[in-house]
Every structure is written in structure tokens, then in C-alpha cells.
Amino acid sequence: MEKEEQLFRKRIQELAENAYSRDIPLHTDFLTLAEQTVFQNMSATLPPVKFVLSGGFPMSERKVLCFLASYEEELYAPPFVCLKIVPANRRFAEELTHRDYLGAIMNLGIERAMIGDIVLQDGNAWAFVMEKMSRYLAENLTMIRHTSVVTGITADFSELPEPEMEEISGTVSSVRLDSVIALCGRLSRTRAASYIEDEKVSVNGAVCTNVSLNLRGGEILSIRGIGKFRFGEPGNLKKKGRTSVVVYRYK
């Protein structure tokens, strides 16, 4: 186990113990997919305190882990907000990317862990950030590259677009990683195994070289040079022992 993971586990353990013993709500900053996986793997060893993993919308990847106080379980309020960022003048607006928005926010001195998902559509952006940073960003995030923008805090998530995805369905001999990667990339199983062994495949943000890893459903899979996918829930068992599955490719 790497030192970074050991420190993360220790921090989560301390948060859970404090939340449970003092009956107070405590939370992390935004966690990566890999950190969320570490937490899920250790959750059974933590004190019996209720928790919420939330990133602001169902398809979010970066999420905040909140340990709840007993009195707060029905009144949970996330410690983050959503910023809506729009061009001040669309006529002169550039075509901006996720990297442009993230870079502009971090150039204001905001650490990556303070920033959740950033969703783009039609020249607008929605960025989830920790609440303690929101007022500063609303006042100071006025330029993305060479485009003047207006930044405000919004509670209206109805406009928030869902990621565009291509549905890929098929059957696999098992829900092992190599079988699912073969379906995602339209590869032979042997070729898929080579991608995995060559460290070209990530599962929930962490490089995975275990070709026989069994997937549960909901994992984010990245294949270098091919794309990013979300694995759906395994379906029914078909003829000849094959399992029907659906994966979604991010466009």
C-alpha cells in the first residue's frame, strides 16, 4: 500500500471516529474515483455512522464524503454549491474546454480537491465547488482564457445537462475486466488483456492490471487512446452461459 493511500485511510478513519463519538457532521473535500473506491473497500471497518457520497447530480464522478450526525440524517445539506458560468457576451466568446474552466479556477488559488465536476453545454458551464470557496469564485472568476464571463451561485439544477453517451450492448462470457474492455473497445479478448497488462486501462481512476477483476456495475473505465466508459449493471444470463451487459461511452 502506498504512503498516500495510507494517509488517506487514516484521515477517513479519524473523520468517521470523530463523527461517531461526538455525534457531529464531518466531511471531506471532493474525492477522486480512486479515493472513493478506497473508502468503499474500508467502509465495513469504520464505526457505525451513516454517510452520504454526493457530487451534486446522479452522474457526478468527483464526490464529497459526508459523515452524518444522528440528528442530521433527514436534514442533510451538502457542503458544496454549484456555480453557473456564462459568457458576458456570446458574440465574442471562445469555444472553451473543461481544461480551460478548471485552469481558470485553479489559477485563482483554488486547490483541485475544492472542485468537483464541471459540466459544459452550449457555451455555459456548471462547476461544483466547496461552499467556502463559492463567494470568492463568484466575485473573482471573470475571465476564462480571453473570454469575459459572469459567475453566479445557482440552486436550479434543472438546466444541468447529462453527459452525452453512446450505448453499447452485447454479451460477454463473464464480467471480468478483460471481457468488458473487449466490448468497450471492440477488441479481441487477447488484445483487451494486452491493454490491461500494459497499464492502459483505469478502473474508477486507478490503473488496473488485473485482467480477471470482476466488475460489479457502475465502474468508470478508461482505455488509453480509445475513450471513457461507464459499465452498467450486469444483465440476464443468456444461452451458452454468456451475460448480457450494457456500457456507455462518453462522447
Task: Please report, for each region that a protein language model flagged, where it lies by residue.
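Basic (Lys/Arg-enriched) interaction patch that binds polyanionic ligands
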Residues: 174-225
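Ferredoxin-like alpha/beta domains used as RNA- or RNAP-binding modules
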Residues: 1-178, 184, 207, 214, ...
